[in-house]
Amino acid sequence: MSMGLEITGTALAVLGWLGTIVCCALPMWRVSAFIGSNIITSQNIWEGLWMNCVVQSTGQMQCKVYDSLLALPQDLQAARALIVVAILLAAFGLLVALVGAQCTNCVQDDTAKAKITIVAGVLFLLAALLTLVPVSWSANTIIRDFYNPVVPEAQKREMGAGLYVGWAAAALQLLGGALLCCSCPPREKKYTATKVVYSAPRSTGPGASLGTGYDRKDYV
């Protein structure tokens, strides 16, 4: 695997990791749906993993941290845990990638470096899946409630920017992890012993046919 490809994969994975952190912090997983009587409302409601915010038409915003975890919907409760685990897993994957990088001297053996890089790629892939699951789950819940006639219009929500950031972060980590997993260990060179046969030098003199150093005329 070339160093350029390794750096590209690591950079994409790091961008995805930073995107996951932004996705976790943004209070815009769910936003007010301006339908029906909500069209003329003077405020916009944002709901995130840790707080909800009310934005007035004047631009003033008030945010409040959730008082109880049990008051959250199931998808947001699961999203909290999965997103935090994804962030920690990607951070550990970054440390592993730095250890196995070709530009570092933490490990001298090239084969060991390649295996460590593959482990880092797998960690980034797992982090991407842990990010993708809660984001997609929340989006599915929002869409299902939006088209549910039983849910009042005031409680219907639309997908916020946090979900789109989460999808982009998961895609970057998937791509970066896949590139790191392409790091194949170098093949070991096998040397085969070659047999060398030594033969005595053959004499080309006149007495070579008799196997002695005398000339033929000495026997006449």
Swiss-Prot record:
UniProt GO MF annotations: cell-cell adhesion mediator activity; identical protein binding; structural molecule activity; transmembrane signaling receptor activity
Residue numbers on the Extracellular membrane side: 30-80, 137-159
Region feature (Interactions with TJP1, TJP2 and TJP3): 219-220
Membrane topology reported for the UniProt record: Multi-pass membrane protein
Location (main, coarse): other
Top-rank taxon: Eukaryota
Quaternary structure annotation from Swiss-Prot or TrEMBL: Can form homo- and heteropolymers with other CLDN. Homopolymers interact with CLDN1 and CLDN2 homopolymers. Interacts in cis (within the same plasma membrane) with CLDN19. Directly interacts with TJP1/ZO-1, TJP2/ZO-2 and TJP3/ZO-3.
Family (UniProt): Belongs to the claudin family.
Disease: CLDN3 is located in the Williams-Beuren syndrome (WBS) critical region. WBS results from a hemizygous deletion of several genes on chromosome 7q11.23, thought to arise as a consequence of unequal crossing over between highly homologous low-copy repeat sequences flanking the deleted region.
Function: Barrier-forming claudin. Plays a major role in tight junction-specific obliteration of the intercellular space, through calcium-independent cell-adhesion activity.
The protein, known as: Claudin-3
Species annotation: Homo sapiens (Human)
